Amino acid sequence: MNSYTVGVEPRCFALVPCAGTGSRSGALTAKQYAPVAGQPLVAHTLQALARVDRLAATLVVLAPDDDHFDDALPGFAGARGWVARVGGASRAESVANGLAELVARGAQPQDWVLVHDAARCLVRADAVDRLIDACANDEVGGLLALPLADTLKQADGQDRVAGTVDREAKWAAQTPQMFRLGLLQPALRAALDAGVTITDEASAVEALG
């Protein structure tokens, strides 16, 4: 038993950063609202998370000026569906602001937060359940990942092939990424304050050493 769980049963919360604007792709509409099979992409994502019974709630972090979500998912907000327009200038800032929102809504340091990208609509509820099972008794947490299948090449300074990278023990990080709130929040804050480039939650935790 670790220090987070003494006498307290931790809850699981999903946090979905959904504040992207589509600026990197040049799209007129953010990719999370692109239509897929008759629904906005993010709707499929949230439907999958809704099938995970162990999630106490799912918090969607939107840009302050988002004017698409309410029309796209009019029935989402409720007891297990939370929305906060606290998105930041980067994904990491949006997640950090979302963590603060969870605290404001009563989440405790021992609770688990599963951060999942809004655009990853193919996530399966059973995969999320397996992640929760795998991390429930862990001190730190974990993430979904796939073993690398492609051949990787190392480039030199002139963008010429310098060698082949061994794929042994190499994995492609996926989401959700599951960490305790009391660990992830200070890890992400420290990385942002230090100007460290954070590409996912695991990299923030790794930066703690």
Stretches with model-predicted labels:
Residues W112-H116:
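Short aromatic-hydrophobic micro-motifs that form the base-stacking/packing surface
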Residues R54-T58, W82, V140, A190-D193:
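Short active-site oxyanion
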Residues R91, A118-L122:
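Acidic metal-phosphate-binding loop of nucleotide-sugar-dependent transferases
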Residues P109, V123-G209:
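Conserved core of the sugar-phosphate nucleotidyltransferase
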